[in-house]
Design a protein with these regions (language model features):
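Condensing-enzyme catalytic core mediating Claisen C-C bond formation in acyl metabolism
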Residues: 1-48, 151-228, 232, 236, ...
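Buried hydrophobic positions in well-ordered alpha/beta secondary-structure cores of metabolic enzymes
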Residues: 6-8, 34, 63, 74-77, ...
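Short beta-strand segments
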Residues: 7-10, 80, 110, 135-141, ...
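Acidic-glycine-rich active-site phosphate/pyrophosphate-binding loop
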Residues: 27-36, 86-100, 137-146, 206-211, ...
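Claisen-condensing/thiolase-fold acyl-transfer catalytic domains that form or cleave C-C bonds
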Residues: 53, 57-60, 64, 83-84, ...
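Anion-binding (especially nucleotide phosphate/pyrophosphate-binding) glycine-rich loop
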Residues: 66, 70-102
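Short glycine-rich phosphate-binding loop at a beta-alpha junction
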Residues: 72-80, 249-258
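Flexible, glycine-rich active-site loops centered on histidine and acidic residues
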Residues: 128-164
């Protein structure tokens, strides 16, 4: 039976480090306030002129190098982002161009913080049915250019960072290696709990002076509701994956959760009963890079030796929509 193996990982973050103290120049906040509520010490923001496609290409090159695979062997690109470089076309085609590729499909997905797992689910299905052999899966975000750097937007602005992460997925016949299963869900009744209202194609014009004055072009969130659902849905969907494969939480060697908030990750860890050495968090250094958090964290965990061949990797995410998902991978 054909399975999907993760054969290479890579990531790229901007060189501009933005500390909590720097944010105090823009809004009423403090390093202590941010750390206590989010666990974040600093995040990376792009410099002017940096594109999502450019960061995605850097992460992709690292992942391809790690896999020992030339870019020309990639059969398809799946790219997850909620902050595309342009309204259209999708960022995936710009990544394709950056890598010097031609004619292969480039699919953009918008599933917010769950985007990488949605992308993994799609890519895994393509590989299992034999449609493609080698797929480049990327999560990339530039959030810093779209946040409200004032006290009004403080709850959101302190969270977000920029970056890209990539994984090279390849078909394998190894019976003990690869993606065991993916599990994805959505619940649109909560769509306005975490969202960005403008610009919007149903508006004429898509964005106007009133939208700008009222900050509708900035992301908005009911933090309490998001927290409540995140700490419930992520352990639940991990349990779904474990049950589907006849496994228990004790079988997990490494959990890489979406890096939304350190308090959320810690709550998920407690509910699953995992020790500190079986979870990987890096939100302290990068903030929430939405669709890029999982591949960035995975790439770092691999380079730190946190995964051994045959180990059980669990990925889980929760995000705007609401969307959420999980995956189990035998490394």
């Amino acid at each position: 039976m054909t399975r999907t193996a993760i054969v290479g990982t890579g990531y790229h973050v901007p060189d501009r480090v933005v500390t909590n103290d720097e944010l105090t120049r823009h809004m009423d906040t403090s390093d202590e306030w941010i750390r206590e509520r989010t666990g974040i010490r600093e995040r990376r923001w792009v410099r002017e002129g940096t594109t999502g496609a450019g960061m995605a290409a850097e992460a992709a090159r690292m992942a391809l190098d790690d896999a020992g695979i030339p870019a020309g062997e990639v059969d398809a690109i799946v790219l997850a982002t909620l902050s595309p470089d342009h309204f259209f076309p999708g960022t995936g085609v710009f990544l394709q161009r950056e890598l010097g590729l031609d004619l292969i499909p480039a699919l953009d997905l918008r599933a917010q913080c769950s985007g990488f797992l949605y992308g993994l689910s799609v890519a895994d299905a393509w590989i299992r049915v034999g449609q493609y052999r080698t797929i480049l899966l990327v999560g990339v975000e530039i959030q810093s250019t779209g946040i409200d750097l004032s006290t009004r937007g403080r709850d959101m602005a302190v969270l977000f960072g920029d970056g890209a992460g990539a994984a090279v997925l390849q078909a394998t016949d190894d019976p003990v290696r690869g993606v065991l299963s993916t599990h994805i869900h959505a619940q649109g009744e909560h769509a306005e709990t975490l969202w960005c209202d403008a610009s919007a194609s149903f508006r004429h014009p898509r964005i106007g002076p009133e939208d700008l004055a009222e900050g509708r072009h900035y992301p908005r969130m009911d933090g309490r509701e998001v927290f409540k659902h995140a700490v419930s849905r992520m352990p639940e969907v991990v349990g779904e994956a474990l049950a589907a494969n006849g496994l228990q939480a004790d079988d997990i060697d490494l959990l890489v959760p979406h890096q939304a908030n350190l308090r959320i990750s810690q709550m998920v860890q407690r509910r699953l009963g995992l020790d500190d050495d079986r979870i990987y968090n890096n939100i302290q250094r990068y903030g929430n890079t939405t669709a890029a958090t999982i591949p960035i964290a995975l790439a770092e965990a691999v380079r730190e030796g946190r995964l051994e061949r045959g180990g059980l990797l669990c990925l889980c995410a929760f995000g705007s929509g609401f969307t959420w998902g999980s995956a189990l991978v035998r490394w």
